[in-house]
Amino acid sequence: LIIGAGAAGLFLAANLRGKSVALLEKNGSAGKKILASGGGRCNVTNRRIDASNYLGDAGFVKNILKNLDFKDILKFFGELKFNEQKQSQFFCESGAKDVLGVLLGRARQSGAQIFCGVCVKGVRKILADENSKIADAFSALNGDKFEGFCGSDAPNLQNVRRNLDEIFEIVAENGDKFYAKNLVVASGGLSYKSLGASDIGYEIAQSFGIKVVPPAPALVGFTVQKDEFWFKNLSGVCFPAQILLERAPQKSGDDSKSCSQSKSGDADTKEDKFSVCRETIGANLKQSSDKSAPLQTNDLNSKKVVTLAASRQNGEIELNLTANEAPLDKNREFYESDAKFNASQEIEFNGGEILNGDAKAWKSNQKNRTKIAGDVLFTHKGISGPAVLNASLFWQKGLIEINFCPNFSIETAQKSKKQLSTVLPLPRRFTLEFLSAAGLSDKPYGKYAQAEREKILRLFSYRFAPAGTFGFERAEATKGGVDTDALEADCGVKGVRGLYFIGEVLNVTGMLGGYNLHFAFACAWALAGRLNAK
């Protein structure tokens, strides 16, 4: 018995052979999310399927994906035509309705029955030594067969007596009861609430002692705080950009250590030397080949050689910068390990992080950074678009950074006598709103004062902390869910024979581009292989 007639549930039913299969669907019809996916065109897979495109346990994801590639899925939907578009996505030429039609047709060909309008309330496993539960199970018999089982191979009374410890009882909200030897939970996540999203899968998992990672909206836009309210004046404006944000920290060996810290000399030295994790506007700092030498940079504006040295005293780092052996302007701002600091400040060093006052620090481990390119779309609520939706998957309630001009050099503006809104490769409406929010007028770049230019350079590294997301109503997916540590490689629950979880209900979420549908199909394929072998 399968709870949920969505992508995972239907694909599983379509690939089971010689089984008595029933699907319970909460909605009045199956596959509502499928019909809404890809803007109604249903992007079923991606040529570049890889675990790196998912948030979740990489080992589990790799194992699920290894036996089903994009060609297998296209073959399954062989009678349909798919157009491969940018970023290797495959959209159905005739629309999502036909994709759902193939899934329903194949499931029914395999003998599956779909019961719609059935809202599951709870699940329990009947144990042989619980006489009252056995009596309840027997009372549900019609002749010598269980209700909820379909087909000639439904378990007879003799088999029921022998295998009562393997039977699940599924109770619907209207009081109906269904019984199954194998129970598959494919109920999805909490996204698209208007399409009948439910948390029943999480409740079932918890009732069996399985950990559920708190679900949160994913592939969703960001709302903004007061400083970014100017975004709302740009509703409808869309253009390519690049977003940089942190992934959750990795729990593996030296990965938790700073990539920017390296000791020079012996272990008792009082001086630490630093490399810098990324190129910054105006200066490209890099570690000398001599590990004991301080950092140097060619300043793009003054062509001076800038030297950075750091000394540790009582757990603090004092930064000293010089240009051609003369003290550097103390008000000049630099970036070290992606944390903004002032050259004259003392900055606390704590576990691989640089802290600037009470501002949140960006971790110095570049391995935990995610860089996402794509369109950004401004809305009346904040900011959305493919790049933002993908960024929301990895967002950890903190800062994000947007480069609004990823393929533009400020030197081009420096050489031009045209107004900035004309020179920049951005919608003029956006540039004017950005300048207005910064208290600047539109004029040639050369006519801005140095302090004003610093504001303009934020276009290349605009950092802000979103207020939140648009929520589950607007989310295309759910991150969080049933902890995959509780599952075997084929999605069976460890220690609970006959119980399985597949698809979006799991703590695995893919980026935009057909990755989530592919993962749902791949889970179902892995489980079908196990069940067909029984």
Q: Which positions does each model-derived feature cover?
A:
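Feature captures the FAD/FMN-dependent oxidoreductase FAD-binding
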Residues: 67-148, 155-182
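A glycine-rich dinucleotide-binding beta-alpha-beta segment and adjacent secondary-structure elements
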Residues: 116, 436-509
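Glycine-rich active-site loop/strand segments that organize a redox cofactor
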Residues: 39-86
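N-terminal Rossmann-like FAD-binding beta1-loop-alpha1 element of flavoenzymes
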Residues: 1-23
